[in-house]
Amino acid sequence: MAPPAARLALLSAAALTLAARPAPGPRPSPECFTANGADYRGTQSWTALQGGKPCLFWNETFQHPYNTLKYPNGEGGLGEHNYCRNPDGDVSPWCYVAEHEDGVYWKYCEIPACQMPGNLGCYKDHGNPPPLTGTSKTSNKLTIQTCISFCRSQRFKFAGMESGYACFCGNNPDYWKHGEAASTECNNVCFGDHTQPCGGDGRIILFDTLVGACGGNYSSMAAVVYSPDFPDTYATGRVCYWTIRVPGASRIHFNFTIFDIRDSADMVELLDGYTHRVLVRFDGRSRPPLSFNVSLDFVILYFFSDRINQAQGFAVLYQATKEEPPQERPAINQTLAEVITEQANLSVSAAHSSKVLYVITSSPSHPPQTVPGSHSWVPSVGASGHRVEGWTVYGLATLLILTVTAVVAKILLHVTFKSHRVTASGDLRDCRQPGTSGEIWTIFYEPSTTISIFKKKLKGQSQQDDRNPLVSD
C-alpha cells in the first residue's frame, strides 16, 4: 500500500486533472427524438462537420439499394438532395460516399443536433475507474430501455451501455471525466434490438433514467416526456400519469414530435391539473395536431394501453410561457421635434404665401401651446423668414376687440345723428310762420349749412357736445 503522503499526492493530482477537464457544453436544439435518428430531417450533407466526406445525392445513387427511383414519395426522408438520412432503420443517419474504403460505399454521419433528449452522449471508458461506478450487468438481449429500467429500479440516475451487451448504472456527476467521443463511436448495435445503438469498445453511451418511465413530475420550463418503455415499444396494460406544473406560466405549448399509437383503445389524454377535467384525447384514430396550447400552468398527461397491441408510443415536447406584467411606458423625451404636415405643398406655400404655417411639434426651447380640442400647436416659420411668437394670438384678439368697439361706436353715432336730424325737422316746422318768401329761404338755407359744418365738427370732435347742432359759428 502506498504511504499516506503518496496517496495524498495522487488524490491531489487526480483532483487537478478533473478540475482542468471541462464539462460537456450545452447541446444544440434537438433535431431527433428517436434513439437512432430515423426522424432526422436536417440538412447536414457531410459525414462529419470537420474532416468528413461529402454525401452523394439520393437521386443519383441508382446503383445502390436506396434512391429516389425506388422510393419516389419521400419515404425515409429521401429526395433530390444529399442530406444524411436513415431510411433502413440503422443505428444512426448515414449517406453514400464516392470514395470507397475496403468496399464500403457508405458512412455514418456525425450529427451533433441528432441526439434525442435524455441521451447524454458518447464517452470514453478507460475502466479505471469507469464512468459509472454503480452496479452493472450483461445480457445478450440488451436494449436501451432494458438497461434504463434496470438502473431505474436500482434508483440510479444514469444508465450506460457498452459493446452492445453491457449495462452500467451510477450517479456519478463526472461521467464525462475520461472525455467525450464522437457519436459514431457508440454505434454498436444492441444485442436485443439491432436498430438501437448500445455503445462501443471502450465507449459508453449514457442515458437519463427518466427516459421511458411510467409517470413522473415535471416543473421545468421545457422538457420532453416519452411514453413508457421508450425507445422500446410500450408494454400492454400500462396506466401512467405525468404531472406538468410550472408555477406562474400563462400557457403551455405541446408538440407531439412522435406519435405512434395504432390501437383506438390505447389513448393519451391531457387533463386540467386542478379539476381533472379532460381537455383533449388522442388515440390510434384521432391523432394530435402538429402543436397546440393549453392556457394552464398545471396539466396532467395520462396514458393508457390495453392488453392487445403495442407500438413505439409518443414523445411530446412541452414549452411553458410566462407573460411578464406590462411595464409602465417611460415618459416621452421631448427633445426631438416631430413634424406632421403635407410635404408636397409645403415648399410652394412657403415661397409664395405670407400665411403662418402651423405644424405639430415639440421643442425644449419653445414650450407647446395648448389649444382646447386639438394637439399642442406652435407656429412655425413663415415666408418672410421671421418666427411668429406665441403672443401673436393676443395681438389678434386685441385687434378684434378694437374692431368691434369701432363698429359699435359707429352704430351709436349713426343713431345719435338720426335723432338730431329728427329734432331739426321739427324745428323747421315750427319756424314756418307767415311772412315774406325771402325769410323762409334764409331760414331753410342756414340749417343746411350748419348741419354740414356740424358733421365736420363731429369728425374732428373739437366742439362741446352740449351745443345745439343747428347753431353755426
From Swiss-Prot:
Gene3D superfamilies documented for this protein: Plasminogen Kringle 4, Spermadhesin, CUB domain
- Native organism: Rattus norvegicus (Rat)
| Annotated stretches, region: Essential for apoptotic activity | 414-473
What is the protein's known function?
Receptor for Dickkopf proteins. Cooperates with DKK1/2 to inhibit Wnt/beta-catenin signaling by promoting the endocytosis of Wnt receptors LRP5 and LRP6. In the absence of DKK1, potentiates Wnt-beta-catenin signaling by maintaining LRP5 or LRP6 at the cell membrane. Can trigger apoptosis in a Wnt-independent manner and this apoptotic activity is inhibited upon binding of the ligand DKK1. Plays a role in limb development; attenuates Wnt signaling in the developing limb to allow normal limb patterning and can also negatively regulate bone formation.
Residue stretches spanning the membrane: 393-413
GO terms, molecular function: transmembrane signaling receptor activity
Which positions form S-S bridges? 32-114, 55-95, 84-109, 122-186, 147-167, 151-169, 190-198, 214-240
Q: Which UniProt keywords apply?
A: Cell membrane, Disulfide bond, Glycoprotein, Kringle, Membrane, Signal, Transmembrane, Transmembrane helix, Wnt signaling pathway
According to the UniProt entry, where is the signal peptide?
A: 1-19
UniProt-listed InterPro entries:
CUB_dom (IPR000859), Kremen (IPR017076), Kremen_rcpt (IPR051836), Kringle (IPR000001), Kringle-like (IPR013806), Kringle_CS (IPR018056), Kringle_sf (IPR038178), Sperma_CUB_dom_sf (IPR035914)
Domain WSC stretches: 116-210
* Top-level division of the source organism's lineage: Eukaryota
- CUB domain boundaries: 214-321
Q: Name one GO cellular component term.
A: neuronal cell body
Task: Outline which residue ranges sit on the Cytoplasmic face.
Answer: 414-473
Q: How does it assemble?
A: Forms a ternary complex with DKK1 and LRP6. Interacts with LRP6 in a DKK1-dependent manner. Interacts with DKK1 and RSPO1 (via FU repeats).
Q: Report what the protein is called.
A: Kremen protein 1
Query: Where found?
Result: Cell membrane
Q: Where are glycans found on this sequence?
A: 59, 217, 255, 293, 333, 345
Q: Does the keyword Signal apply?
A: yes
